[in-house]
């Protein structure tokens, strides 16, 4: 690694071009971003995954070879093998790599290098990381700071999950991988902390929420400064070991504060103040209070790096969100079709609140995600959905988890019905869901497909895209 900023044209020439990195699981949103960043630095890159996808096809078009399936032969001629900590140590590719003297590195070690290479921003938190990271990069771009970015979603402004630039490196840091705790960055942006990615037998999950929150504290403690959400209870207790501590939010006394909020059906206009000094007016073109906070964080970070507020705010006003985060898919009989990644209770509640802001009848197609997550949070999921006018609950998206006895999607729908919701039903037949919505959708509706599984496919089917 060099001292030049990540992903710059200067740094690309400094990396020996003969190095060959092979990335397992290259079809994942994060690993594919690593592949693109490495390729931009002049490294020879290849990868493999179990199934083809739109992402793997894009990588091939970009000149990055992708093999389907896993095979020890993939490591032949490879210098470095990148694999998630979740990959079993006895996996044939890992065994073959170690036997051949190939360096095996976890993904987080690679991200650590990128964060340490120059000015950097690491975004952590249980919710809002992808949107906040995207907004920071877009705001910095608008302000002329030419950021590089690593995002856990496709950013429409970039047409990719990465951006190559010579300015600060902005990265989404995923707490589902325990390796994040040892990373170091210049500025840590801390959105919130809750109990996701905890328990069960996932190799990289945390045993307890206390352990996870201690890891959050360790991460921000290693940063030169932290910008944390003043509105989220308890975050101030997790940032006590950080160097410079700044916060943002709606709370009185926040260093960066959003005031005079004016919500409408399409988003929210608000005023930004820095320690009492008005910086100007901003707008986020996505509904929901959570998106006001995400945008405020982005404007605060841009200000900290010397960016122009007005041009940053203008860029954010045109921002329409990364893929699967309140993503407008199209229309059906005049109804607005939205797809959203919300899969835990806090995200679901935020998405429902955003839908209510549109002023339309809120109709949700919800797909619970993972048996373990459903087991841990089905009452909260049900309660979070109570604000919708109608909820169709699909079967659980398993994410390759084995079934847990007694854990079923009907736990959510039954609790809602027992709590007095008259518009909820369990709907396992997807074809019937599509037929029903096509027959009943009208211009007064917003239909939101919601979940981290493949429920997004229904939104495309409904909108005929």
From Swiss-Prot:
Reactions accelerated catalytically: UDP-N-acetyl-alpha-D-muramate + L-alanine + ATP = UDP-N-acetyl-alpha-D-muramoyl-L-alanine + ADP + phosphate + H(+)
Listed as disulfide-bonded, the cysteine pairs are none
Name the residues that bind ATP.
Answer: 125-131
The transmembrane residues are: none
User: EC top class, in one word?
Assistant: ligase
Query: Pathway, per UniProt?
Result: Cell wall biogenesis; peptidoglycan biosynthesis
Write out the entry's keywords from A to Z.
Answer: ATP-binding, Cell cycle, Cell division, Cell shape, Cell wall biogenesis/degradation, Cytoplasm, Ligase, Nucleotide-binding, Peptidoglycan synthesis
Q: Does the keyword Cell wall biogenesis/degradation apply?
A: yes
What GO cellular-component annotations does this UniProt entry give? cytoplasm
Q: What is its EC number?
A: 6.3.2.8
Annotated GO molecular function terms are: ATP binding; UDP-N-acetylmuramate-L-alanine ligase activity
- GO BP, sorted A to Z: cell division; cell wall organization; peptidoglycan biosynthetic process; regulation of cell shape
Pfam families tied to this protein:
Mur_ligase, Mur_ligase_C, Mur_ligase_M
User: Where is this protein localized, as stated in its record?
Assistant: Cytoplasm
Q: Which family does it belong to?
A: Belongs to the MurCDEF family.
**What biological function has been recorded for the protein in this entry?**
Cell wall formation.
**What name is this protein filed under?**
UDP-N-acetylmuramate--L-alanine ligase
- Give the gene that encodes this protein: murC
């Amino acid at each position: 690694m060099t001292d030049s900023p990540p992903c710059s044209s200067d740094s690309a020439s400094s990396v020996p071009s003969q190095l060959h990195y092979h990335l397992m699981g290259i079809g994942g949103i994060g690993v594919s971003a690593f592949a693109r960043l490495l390729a931009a630095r002049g490294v020879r890159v290849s990868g493999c995954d179990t199934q083809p996808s739109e992402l793997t096809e894009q990588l091939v078009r970009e000149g990055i070879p992708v093999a389907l399936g896993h095979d020890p032969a993939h490591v032949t001629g490879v210098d470095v093998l990148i694999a998630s900590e979740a990959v079993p140590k006895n996996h044939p590719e890992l065994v073959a790599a170690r036997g051949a003297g190939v360096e095996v590195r976890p993904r987080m070690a690679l991200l650590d290098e990128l964060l340490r290479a120059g000015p950097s921003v690491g975004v952590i938190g249980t919710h809002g990381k992808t949107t906040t990271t995207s907004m920071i990069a877009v705001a910095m771009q608008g302000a002329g700071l030419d950021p590089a970015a690593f995002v856990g979603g496709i950013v429409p402004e970039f047409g990719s999950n990465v951006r190559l630039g010579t300015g600060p490196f902005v990265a989404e840091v995923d707490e589902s991988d325990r390796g994040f705790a040892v990373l170091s960055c210049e500025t840590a942006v801390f959105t919130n902390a809750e109990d996701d990615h905890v328990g069960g037998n996932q190799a990289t999950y945390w045993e307890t929420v206390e352990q996870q929150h201690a890891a959050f504290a360790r991460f921000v403690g290693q940063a030169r400064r932290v910008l944390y959400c003043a509105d989220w209870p308890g975050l101030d207790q997790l940032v006590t070991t950080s160097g410079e501590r700044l916060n943002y939010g709606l709370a009185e006394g926040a260093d960066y504060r959003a005031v005079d909020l004016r919500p409408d059906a399409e988003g929210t206009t608000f005023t930004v103040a820095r320690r009492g000094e008005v910086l100007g007016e901003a707008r986020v073109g996505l509904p929901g209070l959570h998106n006001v906070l995400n945008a405020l964080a982005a404007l605060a970070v841009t200000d900290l790096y010397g960016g122009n507020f007005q041009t940053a705010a203008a860029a954010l006003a045109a921002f329409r969100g990364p893929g699967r985060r309140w993503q407008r898919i199209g229309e059906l009989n005049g109804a607005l079709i939205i797809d959203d990644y919300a899969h835990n209770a806090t995200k679901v509640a935020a998405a429902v609140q955003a839908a209510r802001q549109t002023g339309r009848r809120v109709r949700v197609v919800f797909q619970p995600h993972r048996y373990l997550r459903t087991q841990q949070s089905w009452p909260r999921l049900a309660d979070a959905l109570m604000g919708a006018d109608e909820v169709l609950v699909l079967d659980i998206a398993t994410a390759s988890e084995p079934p847990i006895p007694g854990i079923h999607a009907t736990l959510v729908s039954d609790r809602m019905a027992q709590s007095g919701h008259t518009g909820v039903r369990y709907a396992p037949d997807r074809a019937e869901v599509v037929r029903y919505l096509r027959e009943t959708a009208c211009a007064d509706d917003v239909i939101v497909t919601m979940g981290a599984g493949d429920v997004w496919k229904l939104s495309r089917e409904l909108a005929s895209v």
